Protein backbone atom coordinates (compact mmCIF):
# COMPACT_ATOMS: atom_id res chain seq x y z
CA UNK A 1 0.00 0.00 0.00
CA UNK A 2 1.16 3.52 -0.75
CA UNK A 3 1.16 6.15 1.95
CA UNK A 4 -1.26 9.00 1.25
CA UNK A 5 0.31 12.14 -0.17
CA UNK A 6 0.78 15.04 2.20
CA UNK A 7 -1.31 18.15 1.83
CA UNK A 8 0.64 21.09 0.41
CA UNK A 9 0.96 24.64 1.71
CA UNK A 10 2.56 27.26 -0.53
CA UNK A 11 3.96 30.23 1.39
CA UNK A 12 3.57 33.64 -0.24
CA UNK A 13 3.94 37.07 1.38
CA UNK A 14 0.52 38.17 0.09
CA UNK A 15 -1.50 38.05 -3.11
CA UNK A 16 -2.30 41.66 -3.88
CA UNK A 17 -0.69 45.06 -4.32
CA UNK A 18 3.08 45.06 -4.10
CA UNK A 19 3.27 41.25 -4.03
CA UNK A 20 1.86 40.84 -7.54
CA UNK A 21 4.70 39.57 -9.72
CA UNK A 22 5.83 36.61 -11.80
CA UNK A 23 6.92 34.62 -8.75
CA UNK A 24 3.49 34.95 -7.18
CA UNK A 25 1.80 33.87 -10.40
CA UNK A 26 4.04 30.79 -10.62
CA UNK A 27 3.20 29.81 -7.03
CA UNK A 28 -0.52 30.36 -7.60
CA UNK A 29 -0.52 28.34 -10.83
CA UNK A 30 1.54 25.53 -9.29
CA UNK A 31 -0.79 25.38 -6.29
CA UNK A 32 -3.83 25.37 -8.57
CA UNK A 33 -2.45 22.52 -10.69
CA UNK A 34 -1.42 20.42 -7.69
CA UNK A 35 -4.78 20.99 -6.01
CA UNK A 36 -6.21 18.59 -8.60
CA UNK A 37 -4.04 15.83 -7.08
CA UNK A 38 -3.73 16.64 -3.37
CA UNK A 39 -5.24 19.13 -0.93
CA UNK A 40 -3.34 22.38 -1.51
CA UNK A 41 -3.57 25.89 -0.11
CA UNK A 42 -1.81 29.23 -0.29
CA UNK A 43 -0.67 30.62 3.07
CA UNK A 44 0.38 34.25 3.53
CA UNK A 45 3.06 35.37 5.98
CA UNK A 46 3.32 39.17 5.66
CA UNK A 47 -0.10 40.42 4.59
CA UNK A 48 -3.17 38.99 6.31
CA UNK A 49 -5.92 38.25 3.83
CA UNK A 50 -9.46 37.32 4.73
CA UNK A 51 -9.66 34.35 2.38
CA UNK A 52 -6.26 32.77 3.17
CA UNK A 53 -4.67 31.28 6.28
CA UNK A 54 -1.78 33.21 7.90
CA UNK A 55 1.51 31.50 8.76
CA UNK A 56 1.84 32.69 12.37
CA UNK A 57 -1.69 31.49 13.17
CA UNK A 58 -1.04 28.04 11.69
CA UNK A 59 2.28 27.65 13.51
CA UNK A 60 0.56 28.36 16.84
CA UNK A 61 -2.35 26.03 16.11
CA UNK A 62 -0.16 23.18 14.81
CA UNK A 63 3.00 22.75 16.93
CA UNK A 64 5.86 20.64 15.49
CA UNK A 65 5.24 16.95 16.03
CA UNK A 66 1.46 17.29 16.09
CA UNK A 67 -0.55 15.17 13.69
CA UNK A 68 -1.68 18.26 11.77
CA UNK A 69 1.90 19.55 11.38
CA UNK A 70 3.19 16.19 10.17
CA UNK A 71 0.50 15.90 7.48
CA UNK A 72 1.61 19.05 5.64
CA UNK A 73 4.44 19.71 3.21
CA UNK A 74 5.38 23.39 3.23
CA UNK A 75 6.67 24.93 -0.01
CA UNK A 76 8.85 28.03 0.42
CA UNK A 77 9.98 30.14 -2.52
CA UNK A 78 10.23 33.85 -1.83
CA UNK A 79 13.99 34.48 -2.34
CA UNK A 80 15.25 36.68 0.46
CA UNK A 81 12.60 35.34 2.87
CA UNK A 82 13.57 31.67 2.49
CA UNK A 83 16.08 31.51 5.40
CA UNK A 84 13.55 33.09 7.80
CA UNK A 85 10.81 30.76 6.56
CA UNK A 86 13.02 27.69 7.00
CA UNK A 87 13.79 28.72 10.60
CA UNK A 88 10.08 29.25 11.32
CA UNK A 89 9.26 25.84 9.83
CA UNK A 90 12.08 23.92 11.56
CA UNK A 91 10.90 20.44 12.50
CA UNK A 92 8.26 20.37 9.77
CA UNK A 93 8.40 18.87 6.28
CA UNK A 94 9.50 21.61 3.85
CA UNK A 95 10.78 21.96 0.27
CA UNK A 96 12.25 24.95 -1.57
CA UNK A 97 10.60 25.86 -4.90
CA UNK A 98 13.58 27.64 -6.48
CA UNK A 99 12.63 30.14 -9.18
CA UNK A 100 16.08 31.73 -9.44
CA UNK A 101 19.49 31.86 -7.79
CA UNK A 102 21.99 34.20 -6.22
CA UNK A 103 20.16 35.13 -3.03
CA UNK A 104 23.27 34.31 -0.99
CA UNK A 105 21.86 31.83 1.50
CA UNK A 106 22.70 28.19 2.14
CA UNK A 107 20.03 25.54 2.44
CA UNK A 108 20.05 23.21 5.42
CA UNK A 109 20.91 19.60 4.51
CA UNK A 110 17.91 17.54 3.51
CA UNK A 111 15.69 20.36 2.23
CA UNK A 112 14.61 19.29 -1.27
CA UNK A 113 15.07 21.81 -4.08
CA UNK A 114 12.33 21.94 -6.72
CA UNK A 115 14.00 23.99 -9.46
CA UNK A 116 11.92 25.66 -12.16
CA UNK A 117 14.72 25.60 -14.75
CA UNK A 118 18.08 24.08 -15.67
CA UNK A 119 20.15 27.11 -14.66
CA UNK A 120 18.54 27.18 -11.23
CA UNK A 121 19.00 23.42 -10.90
CA UNK A 122 22.69 23.80 -11.81
CA UNK A 123 23.17 26.57 -9.26
CA UNK A 124 21.65 24.53 -6.44
CA UNK A 125 23.51 21.43 -7.63
CA UNK A 126 26.71 23.37 -6.96
CA UNK A 127 25.68 25.03 -3.67
CA UNK A 128 23.47 22.32 -2.14
CA UNK A 129 24.84 19.17 -3.74
CA UNK A 130 23.76 16.93 -0.85
CA UNK A 131 20.16 18.11 -0.93
CA UNK A 132 17.61 16.25 -3.05
CA UNK A 133 17.37 18.15 -6.37
CA UNK A 134 14.40 18.02 -8.74
How should these model regions be labeled?
Residues 1-3, 133-134:
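Short intrinsically disordered, low-complexity coil segments enriched in acidic
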Residues 14-26:
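A short, glycine/small-residue-rich beta-strand->loop->alpha-helix junction that serves as a flexible
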Residues 5-8:
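Extreme N-terminal starter segment of soluble prokaryotic enzymes
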Residues 1, 12, 28, 32, ...:
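Extended catalytic core of nucleotide-activated donor transferases of GT-like folds
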Residues 10-11, 41:
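Extended, folded domain segments that form the structural surfaces/walls around functional sites
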Residues 119-120, 132-134:
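Short beta-strand->alpha-helix junction loop in the catalytic core
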Residues 42-44, 134:
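A structural preference for short, hydrophobic beta-strand core positions in alpha/beta folds
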Residues 35-42:
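A generic structural motif
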Amino acid sequence: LRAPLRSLRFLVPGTSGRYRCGGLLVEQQTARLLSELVPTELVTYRQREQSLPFLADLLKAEPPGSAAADQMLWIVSWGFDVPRQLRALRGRPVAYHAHSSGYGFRLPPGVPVLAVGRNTLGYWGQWASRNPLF
